[in-house]
Amino acid sequence: MVVDSGSTDGTLDVLAKDPRLEVHHRAFDSFADQCNFGLSLVKTEWVLSMDADYELSDRLVSELRQLTPSAQQMGYRARFVYRIHGRPLRGTLYPPRTVLYRTRMGRYEKEGHGHRIRLSGAVSPLGGVIYHDDRKPLARWLTSQLGYASREAAHLLETPSEQLSRTDRIRRMGWPAPFLVVFYVLIAKGALLDGSAGWYYAFQRLVAEVLVALALLDRRLSGERA
């Protein structure tokens, strides 16, 4: 099943070639609401939730076919390998996500510019990985980051400090994050060894954190408290 939010790039033509697919249309308002809409339509006991730019590795496909979950098992999380224009990176800031879970137990909540699944029960890691093959044109990526930065700034300011992770508390300060993220991505995550693709990703994360820092400063300087 696919939830489409108004594709104009030929996506629907590709989907129409596979008679197994069921396509539902819904105007986009938030990632969480879009996912919850999709969940409300799922009739199976388990659901594998994926973005359009996810690709399952062969190892993960084989692993999923052999799963025999117990009654207490509510979900499984997978690690990601990020690709820049098809080139895999050694490490990224993209965390493991719960992608396979019992349909009736799942509910998405908004978190910053993104979303997070809430499950009650055992969630185990999977051995295989998912490739996150993001091929957005640079202009489109930059445009989307403006909206993401505004929502992320609101989340960081509105959430009590004790509920934020250490990383998010640093990000809420504004100025440290843009400087730290470049070195963290290049050195700690090994993107320096990925050549031009690694630098591209590091600069992407730098721009994203600069925009979040600007959004935070804008709110503080204008006296706005969303």
Regions found by a protein language model. Give the residues of each.
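Alpha-helical transmembrane segments and their immediate juxtamembrane flanks
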Residues: R225-A226
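A conserved acidic beta->alpha catalytic loop
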Residues: D4-D13, F28, D51
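Short aromatic/hydrophobic "clamp" motif used to bind/position activated sugar donors
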Residues: V47
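Residues lining hydrophobic/aromatic ligand-binding pockets adjacent to catalytic sites
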Residues: S5, T44, Y54
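Hydrophobic targeting segments
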Residues: M1-V3, G195
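Catalytic-site signature of metal-activated, phosphate-bearing donor transferases
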Residues: D33-L39, S57-S222
